[in-house]
Amino acid sequence: MVYNYFMPHFFIKTENVKNNIIEVDDKELLNHLVNARRVKIGEKVLFIDENKIQYVTKICDIERKVLKAEIVDKYPSFRELAIDLTVARCVLKQDADFSAIQKATELGVKTIIPLLCDNCAVKESVVRAKSDKFQKIADESVKQCERADFPVVTEPEKLDEFLKNDSKNYDKILIFSERAKDFGIKKYFAQNPYQKGDKILAVIGCEGGFSDREFKLFEELNLYEISLGKLIMRADTALTAALFGIIQEVGDE
């Protein structure tokens, strides 16, 4: 039976599972459960291990150095995107940027690549200093949406260098651009049918859009520019719409 408590789950290792009890002795997780979430004896808590097995538990003992939870049920987690989807997104101003990472994580992408673009409003030094923060935001979002796996947030890369060096690693590349007009996701996949196992890359611009130099690069690399419709969206909204559109078109079975 699959339970849905609309609550975060917490990551453990199989070594924490002893008979029918989960023993939480990790200091950070123990502190979070006891002092931040203030769990009580008898409260239900969800855990998941590195093998993507989810445990429905009931807290049975809380001590200074360990919390114990009795396993009520366990089952393989189904909360994982079936397609290999990566998003390379130009870095945005802070609130929108964090929102973009959260939404990409919730939508199941495997990899998030921060890009430095010509029209990026954030200095490169600031972006590189935030690399660890980007991964932490993604990790926290995983717990909130009950994903079975963690996305990888890479080190920031310059857009042109990334596309020149790494575009060959993807089977489908979609550059989302306001100038694409009538060529949308549906038309793209009609011309380029998805094959199971294809690695898909979605590239999203920043608030100022792509520069003329970057558009020229897309043409040189024969990359498809994709429209999200007639409306102009904020960059973080465009990311959400683009990823959801790909998932809907390709399917997530």
Stretches found by the model and what they are:
Residues D212-E253:
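Structured adenosyl-cofactor binding patch, chiefly the S-adenosyl-L-methionine
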Residues V45, E70, P76-V87, Y194:
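Mobile, glycine- and charge-enriched loop segments
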Residues A180, E207-G208, K230-M233:
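Short, acidic/turn-prone active-site loops that include or flank metal/cofactor-
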Residues G197-L217:
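A C-terminal functional module that forms or caps the active site or interfaces directly
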Residues P156-Y194, I200:
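A mid-sequence, solvent-exposed acidic-amphipathic segment
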Residues F78-L174:
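RNA substrate-binding interface of SAM-dependent RNA methyltransferases
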Residues M1-P76:
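N-terminal positively charged helical leader segments and presequences
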